[in-house]
């Protein structure tokens, strides 16, 4: 008996057979589910299908709104049916979503495509992390969670770098290839989700716990909104993060192809450019420690946001090669800014506040602003005013960050910041219940597991 137990469950620090299976299947699911072959060419593809700029960016605005609306109910669905079933449902929806443009390359087909993607992503965004966390905890291997999450992201980025340059040549062979391959990848993620083992010892009873968790969610949501209203420091950190997220999302997704086409960079090269941008962002994300500690995190986020704005404005002045270089510089600055802003946001959350709910609110606010920005982007591009859009975006960022800095220096947020950090200094870190610092993993079983936070 003892020998059997020893072979089934190795000593501390070693992975069990089930833990290895969970990690490997999670790698496969995350890589295949997020491998969207059409990403470098979707704008040009929709233009060739006869959609106007207003229609294309209108669909993007609807996508952001839909993602916000799906965010809350899909969390409750995950509680009711369980994370493993939620991953399976999301993979089925994503497979169907990627086939919609193949079945109907029209406004309706692309609208259904993006609405289904919003639903599929909402179903899986928190469930994948929650399943991995609970699976490793059930096997007493939870110390491997952070490495497993990081490796999954790295593999996903590597797959995009390898696959995206192939999109142009593949489209020359079969025009719908990017969408068919995306559907095949999503189907592969479904196979991984079906193969995921049932978690033992997690205490999950989704059906019976749903009511209790739904009530807890409503209480946390109310508490989170009151926390934002009563904490000027937290609200300012959120607003500053909006500049980073909106600029990066709009440029790297919505404006990426119009900018390249405007400067004469052919559609066949878009995949290679996006792959280079992905590498630049990955390097920045992996090396935030390169930023000097002489400046506070707030100052660094502001500086990087201004760098993003300046890069956008500079794109109106350069030629094709300069624009490609500026896009890579933009991606690198985004990579540096994201982890700094994420830690800044975590540090700004009071110790007794519902952290996961507040972070979800931040995500919803970011996407709501993107929805409004996408409408404006569509109007500018449709009118042929791309350069004006880039300059106005840069100026709006400067004005927003200037207002944030004035409020910070005026002392409006000082009292709230002091109450959160305990000393008001940048080195202080708020503690979770139980004394765990906010930038360290929460102990297993606490309310701050990564169940609903997006990467």
Can you say where each PLM-predicted feature lies in the sequence?
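C-terminal transmembrane bundle of multi-pass solute transporters/carriers
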Residues: 59-60, 68-72, 79, 84-85, ...
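Conserved MFS/SLC helix-loop-helix module at the cytosolic interface between two early adjacent transmembrane helices
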Residues: 67-105
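Helix-loop boundary and gating motifs at the non-cytosolic
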Residues: 11-69, 231-275
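C-terminal ends and interior cores of transmembrane alpha-helices
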Residues: 92-106, 306-319
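Cytoplasmic helix-loop-helix junction between adjacent transmembrane helices
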Residues: 115-157
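Juxtamembrane intracellular "pre-TM" segments in multi-pass secondary transporters
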Residues: 2-20, 198-239
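Paired small-residue
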Residues: 108-117, 322-329
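Helix-loop junctions on the cytosolic side of multi-pass membrane transporters
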Residues: 180-211, 406-418
